[in-house]
C-alpha cells in the first residue's frame, strides 16, 4: 500500500546562521545577503516592479522550483504589498504563487530560518501559522485576507509537473527557477522541467535564475524560451533571464476529463448549505457577482443543519484517490475554518475511531499503513485510547488529533451572512424547477412561476442536484439519516473527543449541555420524518460496540429530540465537482473511446453549468476544498489538485471509466 507522507528536509545551520541542506550539501540562500540576491535575481530578473502597474489582469501568477525557506515568496509578497499600497486602483489585485518542494522544512526549522530577515517578519509569521503537514500534493494557503494565494506542491517537481491539470497550461506570468545548484542537485535541472516550464508559461511570460550554466540556457531555449545572460548578483558574474515569445500548443492529455471555466464573472448558486456558502465566498473573493437561490426560508435547513458534525478525513484501504483527496481537504478545511472571521460553536478536541471488532481493527490497521504524519493520524492502543477520549473503551484505534466537531448550522449561516456583507444577493423561498439554455445564458424557472436569467449556474442543492433534465443521469443517490440529541450526564461529560465506532458520539456542546449521537442510514430514502426506531438504534449501536461500558448506558434518547436530514452520495465516496456533463453527447462522442483515445475531443458539457455536490457524510471536510476548486475552475485560475485526483471528482468519471474499458454505460 502506498505511503502518503513526505520526507522533511534535514538541515543544519552554519556559523553564519544560514541553513544548509545535509542532503545536497548546499546553502538555502547566500551567506552574504540572501534577501538582496532574491530581489535582484528573481524580482529584478522578471522585471516585476515594471510589470505590476501595467498588468492587465486582476491576478498575477508566479511559479517557482524549490520553495526552501520561502525567502523568494516572502520577498515577493512584501514587494506586492508595497505595490498595492502605492497603486490601490491598479487592475492587478491579487498574487498567486505556485512552488514545488521535494523536502519541505519543518515548521520549527522554517521559523529559525526566518529569524535571518526581521524585516520580513509580518509576512513570515503568517506563513508559519499556516505551514502545512508533510503530505504529498498541493497545499493551498490563503494569505493576507485571500489577496495572496500560495500553492505549495510537496514532492519531486519533475513528477509533479507531469501530474498538473491541463487548465494550468499557459497561465504562469513569471518563473523563479531556483533550487540547489545544478552541480549539487542535477536530478532537478532536466529537460523535463524546462519543457514543463514552457508548457505552463503564457505568451510573454518571463523567467529568471541565478545560474548561468550552459546546459540550463540551452535546455530552456530548446523548450521555447528566448534566453539572455545578465550580470549576476554580487560576485557572481552572470545569471540567466528568459521570455516566452512563442505561442505553444500543449498536447491535451485525458481530454475526457477536461475542465472549462467562464470569462463571465456572474453566477447563480442553487442551494443553501455549507457548500453553497463557501462557494459564494470563494467566488466573491475573485470578483464575481453571485446570487444564491434557496428553496427554504433560511440557510442550513437541509443536510447542513445539524447541531454538531465531526471533522476528520476519510481514509481508504484500497482507494488511492480517497487517500490523496481527503487528507488534503481536511487540512485545507482546518486552515479555512480557523481563518474565517465569523463565530460558530466548535471544538478541535480530536477524533478517535475505534476498532471495536475484528473487521474494524483490520480496517484501521490498513489505514495506519498509509504512514500519514502523526499530526494527522496515528495509532492508539486501548490504554492510550481511553486516555485520549476520557471514557472506558477497552479497544484501540486511530486518532486524528487536529479533528473535532463544529456546528454546521451556525457555520453555514455565519458564512452566508459574511458573504452577504461582501455583495452576495440571496433569494429564499425559491424552488428551482427547470433550467433552460438561452443563447449564452441560463434561464431559471421557479415553482412560483418566477424566472431569472444568469450567465452561469452552479447546482449545489444537495440530494436534489439530479432533479433537472441536464443532471438527471448523474449517478448519485440520497441517504436519509437521523441524529439524536441527548442530555449530558456526569459520566458522558467525561468524553473529551469525538468517538467513532459503528456510529459516532460527540462531546457535549457547552452551550446547550447536549451530545449528538448517530446516525441512521437509509439509502434512497428522502424522508425527513422522525422515527422512533432510528432513535433506538442510535443508542443500541453504541451499546453493541461497547457492551461493558457503564457510561454508555447513560445515553438517553427518550426525550425524542433528533434531527432528520438527507445527504447526497456516490458509490465511490467522492464528491462531484465541475462542469455538468452532457450524458447523451458523452455516450455518443465516446462510443469508441476505448479504441480511439488519441483522437478524443474534450468532454461534452453544458456550457456555463456546474455542479458541487455528492459530499456524503464528510461534507464538513470536503466542502471547503471543493468550493475552492470549483471557484478556481470557473475563474480560469490554478486549481489546487493534481489531474488524477481531479479526474476522480469529475461528474462524468463513472461513465468515462466504463467507456475507456469499452464497457456499456447503463
UniProtKB/Swiss-Prot annotation:
Start and end residues of each stretch annotated as tRNA (mnm(5)s(2)U34)-methyltransferase: 1-245
Cofactor(s) this protein requires: FAD
Region of interest (FAD-dependent cmnm(5)s(2)U34 oxidoreductase), ranges: 270-666
Transmembrane regions: none
Gene3D superfamilies named among the record's database cross-references: D-Amino Acid Oxidase, subunit A, domain 2, FAD/NAD(P)-binding domain, Vaccinia Virus protein VP39
Keywords for the protein's UniProt record, in alphabetical order: Cytoplasm, FAD, Flavoprotein, Methyltransferase, Multifunctional enzyme, Oxidoreductase, S-adenosyl-L-methionine, Transferase, tRNA processing
GO biological process: methylation; tRNA wobble uridine modification
UniProt subcellular location: Cytoplasm
Gene Ontology cellular-component terms listed: cytoplasm
Pfam families registered for this protein in UniProt: DAO (PF01266), Methyltransf_30 (PF05430)
Reaction equations catalysed: 5-aminomethyl-2-thiouridine(34) in tRNA + S-adenosyl-L-methionine = 5-methylaminomethyl-2-thiouridine(34) in tRNA + S-adenosyl-L-homocysteine + H(+)
UniProt GO MF annotations: flavin adenine dinucleotide binding; oxidoreductase activity, acting on the CH-NH group of donors; tRNA (5-methylaminomethyl-2-thiouridylate)(34)-methyltransferase activity
Enzyme Commission (EC) number: 2.1.1.61, 1.5.-.-
Cited HAMAP family: MnmC
Functional summary from the UniProt entry: Catalyzes the last two steps in the biosynthesis of 5-methylaminomethyl-2-thiouridine (mnm(5)s(2)U) at the wobble position (U34) in tRNA. Catalyzes the FAD-dependent demodification of cmnm(5)s(2)U34 to nm(5)s(2)U34, followed by the transfer of a methyl group from S-adenosyl-L-methionine to nm(5)s(2)U34, to form mnm(5)s(2)U34.
Family named by the database record: In the N-terminal section; belongs to the methyltransferase superfamily. tRNA (mnm(5)s(2)U34)-methyltransferase family. In the C-terminal section; belongs to the DAO family.
Protein name in the entry: tRNA 5-methylaminomethyl-2-thiouridine biosynthesis bifunctional protein MnmC
Gene: mnmC
